[in-house]
Each structure stands twice: as structure tokens, then as C-alpha cells.
């Protein structure tokens, strides 16, 4: 991959969505997963054997399409350089564009974000994408336990996603005014009820977090809540001893439940600098700090302004939301050298294609056609590489990312210098 994790993951997810939507006319779509470190000559030999065996397919059309797909994959393997540290995934097959006779060969070569572990060869009516789902899952998980005498919340933070797993209430009475033996007896009952509540929290925490710990995906536990209850819970033996070792810190909070988790993440931000959620939040807050300055500071936003400044090499960090939905289209004349690049909303591509049929070349009057379509984020990533600009693709699941999407049409930037 290119080295920009947010861009790479966005493009990988986009490819996965596209692949899952492809369907062959018959059992003729080929999926090949090449493990990291596997010799390509071994894979090629296996495919040549499959090519030979495909001559036994009864349907001549299916046989021809399967053989064409295998040959395309063999050609792509020749272009790869060993060793492949991550392995490679190749999909190829004839995809119908409409009725009979509209099939066109499509091939996809993906470099996975994590090493491919197992060799797979699959011939089916759909591309085999199940293993790709595992690659897009965030592997690091933080466990969260919010607790006070009345209620508790157990949850996880995984990448940008906050998940509440369990909410508990104690039924423990509050303080009271009384005296004598009755008061002492009630106090013992309250303490016992509080103890039993802590035991329940510990049991649910063990049930929730131990499987994640055993998979080696639990990065740590964060404990929070109002008052001293959280400290008692952390210090005593309510948690499984292996989970106690994973406690990162405890935090004083005003709230429990999901809002309390967000409050905890804010307070724990110094500890969670590497968490995607905090990196995005800090970057977008930096943009807004520039924006609210009287002269606009080092901020830029909107498609026209950002594209202009990026071409000048003036952007330090480009922020793009994953829902931007723009395609960079290269249009050419079939009669002369005229070329034009335009940004088109992805959901309006069919309309753009229809309009292009009636549009004449401004230079010679010839017919125009689409030469290339590219996702705008992929296009921007290539420009950023040229100008040594950082590009961050942010989720709209967060409040900050949603603001960038709504207010600035999904595109904002922090400049290197004032323009």
C-alpha cells in the first residue's frame, strides 16, 4: 500500500463494496489469494493446471470465460515483484453490463492491509470476498467500565466506534438519617448490596473482555465514574486478575452511559493519541482553530479552493470525508488531442455520460468520450504524494467529521503558509 493508512483503508473498503456487487453470468469468476512470502511460480503452476482442467467444462461460453480469467491472472502475476510481504489478492472474470453479449473482462489486483495467510483459488458466480471482511476490522480494542454506586456501563472503543455492551443498575439505597442498631443494620445491608453490585460488574466485564483478551486484541481497560467507587472497583478483586493487569488508568467523570464514555475518551486523550478517533478529532479541531481567526488563518475549504491550493503545493494537511462521493473524470475528443478533467458527483455519473453524448469538442467539434474515471480520494492522494502533503480520510460517524461533510462539502485543509 501507499503508506497513508486512512486513504489505503478507504480505497480497500471501496474496492470491497464494488467486488461484492459483481455477479457473473455463470460459475466463471475467479478469486485468487496469494499468501505472504509464497513463490509466485508455485501459484502460476497451480493456475496452469486449473487452466488445463477447465477444458472439461461443458458450456463452451463458460469454459472460454474461465480460461480468459485465468490467463489474465497469470499475466498479472508476471508483473509482480517478489517477495510479496503482504501477499496479493486478484479477482478476474467476465461481468455482464446488460443483456447477453454485454460481458466485459474485469480484473482487480489488491494489496491487503495485513498479510494473506492462506492460499485460495475459487471459481464461482460471485467473487469470494469473505476474507476481505477480516482485513477491514480494527484489531485494537479498548475496554471501558464506568461505575458508581447506582449504575454501571460496560463498553468498547474500536477505531472510531463506541459500543455499549451492558448497562447495569444496582438498586443500592442512598444515604439516610437514622440512629441505633437499625441504622447499623441498614448500613451493612447497603454495603452488602454495593459489594454484590461490584461482583456483578466484574462478572459482566470478564464475560465481555476475556474473549477479546484471549484473541490478543484488548489494548487496555479504562475505568471512570463519579466519586470513589471506580477506585474501589479497580483496587479490590472484582475483576479477573488478567484484566486487572490491563487497566491503563481511572478517570473522574460527571456521567455514566455512552455520554460518559465520550467524556472519558476526552480525558484520556493523551493516553490514546494513536486511536483513530482522537487523531481525527485533534486534526479537525486544529482546522477550526485556524478557521475562526479573523483572517481565516491557515484554513482552506470547499472543492474549488482546496483543488487550487493543492495544485500550488500550499497545503500541509488535506482533510477529506469518506462520504464525499466525487469521481474525477478525464474526457477526451476522439478526433483531436483535446483533454479535460472534471469532478462529477458519483451518483450523477449516468446523467453526465448522457450529456456528454450531445457535447461537441470545443476545439474541433468532434465527439467526446470518457477516457478514465477515478475516485476523487485516490486522485487527491496521488496529488498529495507529488506535493508532500498529508491526506487524512475521516469518518462521518464522529461529530467533527460530520461537520466537515455538511459545512464544507467534505473537503478542508490546513495550509503551510498564509495566502
From Swiss-Prot:
Q: Chief localization class? A: cytoplasm
Q: Which GO MF terms are attached to this record?
A: translation release factor activity, codon specific
Q: Which Pfam families match?
A: eRF1_1, eRF1_2, eRF1_3
Entry superkingdom? Archaea
Q: Read off the SUPFAM superfamilies from this record.
A: L30e-like, N-terminal domain of eukaryotic peptide chain release factor subunit 1, ERF1, Translational machinery components
Q: Which UniProt keywords apply?
A: Cytoplasm, Protein biosynthesis
Q: Where in the cell is it found?
A: Cytoplasm
State any GO CC term.
cytoplasm
Q: Which HAMAP family match?
A: Rel_fact_arch_1
Instruction: Spell out the subunit comment.
Output: Heterodimer of two subunits, one of which binds GTP.
Described by its record, this protein's role is as follows:
Directs the termination of nascent peptide synthesis (translation) in response to the termination codons UAA, UAG and UGA.
Q: Provide the family line.
A: Belongs to the eukaryotic release factor 1 family.
Q: What is this protein called?
A: Peptide chain release factor subunit 1
Organism expressing this protein natively: Methanococcus maripaludis (strain C7 / ATCC BAA-1331)
